[in-house]
């Protein structure tokens, strides 16, 4: 006869599968509360209090922490074949349940641990060494994540633990490299034209971060972790059209993120090949239109934004958020309300560009983006070359201070009328004086916005 020890928080959730086990002849043992629940639903269950001699202590805080219980899990001839525990969710802290799971995982050759529906079904249905090792490994990973979450309730950021997810990635950054996902991604794939890749996820997250932080309704197109076009406005179709056409060549095969619901009209207007489309919501009609294409549709959820890299074998994390504070006029004529919106728009998009970056915008559209340059002067030059005649009367944003006045000279020569950039260079006064000399309005940004 097979025997299982269970202790459940969400008792209703597992009622059917435990009834099925009972009907198949399994002997069910349970903590007092779970045993009473099962019996009330017509499932025979043995109460572990018949082993320990008490139902619970301290008002239910101690139920299964007893030498006889753990001897029945850890011994050479264990009392149970499977130990299944559904732990208390945050912010509660489960002590006995975690201990039961760890004990079962330690004695994996004799006892199979399970902590959710998936692992429970595996423990019940398959009995071979590979499955036992898998269940033990998954259990230790699960309890590690559980403890990590509780640690952060006391000291923020003290611990991180992620379980490898089943989400399959097409490949890594390059086709010859493998890739894995650790931690459940905060997005829902509504349609997957082909398997999502490592690069798709990174590009989509950057595109969404910029799109959701635009000053009003807008769209951003990302390619290779940098924006190649963005637009804001009032008409959804026009916004998307302008964002794509801002760099028509580079947007091919890019990632589009919008901060409004993707509807049928916008979906039908999309003629350019895109790898991923990210939106806070999609109408069913839009999904039907876009599902005919080899495009992934992502609906993001809520999550804290972090930027991270593996370096020297360590995971290095940084918060990602826009700086608080307003632009401060340093020199020149104040901009109109519309021009100031363009300036804010440019600053919020340049945040997502690879540093060094300079971005030129006009009438709610990016017209030139110079990014990923070791030299800020070169970034400014690339932005003006891309903008061409559209730079005249436009505004520009720099993701960090101007170390020399030369970048301003390049922007002024192209016709840019105003810039926003943080200060902090030893040549700030020289740069400000050059802006005054060139007739460029200079606004101070609250902080630099590097992106590596």
UniProtKB/Swiss-Prot annotation:
Keywords: Hydrolase, Multifunctional enzyme, Purine biosynthesis, Transferase. Its EC number is 2.1.2.3, 3.5.4.10. Pfam families: AICARFT_IMPCHas, MGS. It comes from the Bacteria. InterPro entries: AICAR_Tfase_dup_dom_sf, Cytidine_deaminase-like, MGS-like_dom, MGS-like_dom_sf, PurH-like. Residues 1-115 form the MGS-like domain. One of its GO terms (molecular function) is phosphoribosylaminoimidazolecarboxamide formyltransferase activity. It catalyses: (6R)-10-formyltetrahydrofolate + 5-amino-1-(5-phospho-beta-D-ribosyl)imidazole-4-carboxamide = 5-formamido-1-(5-phospho-D-ribosyl)imidazole-4-carboxamide + (6S)-5,6,7,8-tetrahydrofolate; IMP + H2O = 5-formamido-1-(5-phospho-D-ribosyl)imidazole-4-carboxamide. The keyword Transferase applies. GO terms for cellular component: cytosol. The keyword Transferase applies. Pathway: Purine metabolism; IMP biosynthesis via de novo pathway; 5-formamido-1-(5-phospho-D-ribosyl)imidazole-4-carboxamide from 5-amino-1-(5-phospho-D-ribosyl)imidazole-4-carboxamide (10-formyl THF route): step 1/1; Purine metabolism; IMP biosynthesis via de novo pathway; IMP from 5-formamido-1-(5-phospho-D-ribosyl)imidazole-4-carboxamide: step 1/1. GO terms for biological process: 'de novo' IMP biosynthetic process. Belongs to the PurH family. HAMAP family: PurH (MF_00139). The IMP cyclohydrolase activity resides in the N-terminal region. This is Bifunctional purine biosynthesis protein PurH. It comes from Thermotoga maritima (strain ATCC 43589 / DSM 3109 / JCM 10099 / NBRC 100826 / MSB8). The lineage of its organism: Bacteria, Thermotogati, Thermotogota, Thermotogae, Thermotogales.
């Amino acid at each position: 006869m097979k025997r299982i020890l269970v202790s459940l928080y969400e008792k209703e959730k597992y009622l059917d599968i435990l009834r099925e086990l009972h009907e198949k002849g399994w002997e069910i043992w349970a903590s007092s509360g779970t045993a009473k629940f099962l019996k009330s639903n017509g499932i025979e269950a043995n109460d572990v209090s018949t082993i320990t001699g008490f139902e619970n202590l301290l008002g239910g805080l101690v139920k299964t922490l007893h030498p006889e219980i753990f001897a029945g899990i850890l011994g050479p001839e264990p009392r149970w074949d499977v130990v299944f525990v559904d732990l208390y969710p945050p912010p509660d802290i489960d002590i006995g349940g975690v201990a039961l799971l760890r004990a079962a995982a330690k004695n994996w050759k004799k006892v199979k641990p399970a902590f959710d529906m998936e692992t429970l079904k595996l423990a019940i249905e398959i009995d071979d060494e590979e499955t036992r090792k898998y269940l033990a490994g998954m259990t230790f990973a699960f309890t590690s994540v559980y403890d990590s979450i509780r640690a952060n309730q006391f000291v923020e950021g003290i611990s991180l633990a992620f379980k490898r997810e089943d989400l399959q990635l097409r490949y890594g950054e390059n086709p010859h490299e493998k890739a894995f996902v650790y931690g459940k991604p905060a997005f829902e794939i509504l349609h997957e034209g082909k398997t999502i890749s490592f690069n798709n996820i990174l590009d989509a997250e950057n595109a969404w971060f910029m799109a959701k932080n635009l000053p009003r309704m807008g769209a951003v197109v990302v390619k290779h972790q940098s924006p190649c076009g963005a637009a804001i406005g009032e008409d959804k179709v026009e916004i998307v059209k302008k964002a794509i056409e801002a760099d028509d060549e580079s947007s091919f095969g890019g990632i589009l993120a919008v901060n409004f619901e993707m509807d049928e009209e916008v979906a039908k207007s999309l003629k350019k090949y895109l790898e991923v489309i990210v939106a806070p919501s999609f109408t069913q009609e839009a999904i039907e239109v876009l599902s005919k294409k080899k495009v992934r549709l992502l609906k993001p959820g809520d999550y804290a934004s972090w930027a991270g890299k593996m370096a020297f074998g360590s995971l290095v994390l940084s918060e990602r958020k826009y700086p608080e504070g307003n632009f401060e006029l340093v020199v020149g004529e104040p901009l109109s309300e519309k021009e100031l919106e363009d300036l804010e728009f440019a600053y919020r998009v340049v945040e997502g560009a690879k540093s060094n970056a300079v971005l030129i915008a006009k009438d709610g559209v990016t017209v030139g983006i110079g990014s990923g340059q070791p030299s800020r002067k070169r970034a400014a030059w690339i932005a003006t070359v891309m903008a061409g005649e559209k730079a005249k009367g436009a505004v520009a944003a720099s993701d960090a201070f101007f170390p020399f006045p030369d970048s301003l000279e390049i922007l002024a020569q192209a016709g840019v009328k105003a810039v926003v950039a943080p200060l902090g260079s030893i040549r700030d006064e020289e740069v400000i004086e050059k802006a005054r000399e060139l007739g460029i309005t200079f606004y101070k940004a609250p902080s630099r916005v590097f992106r590596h």
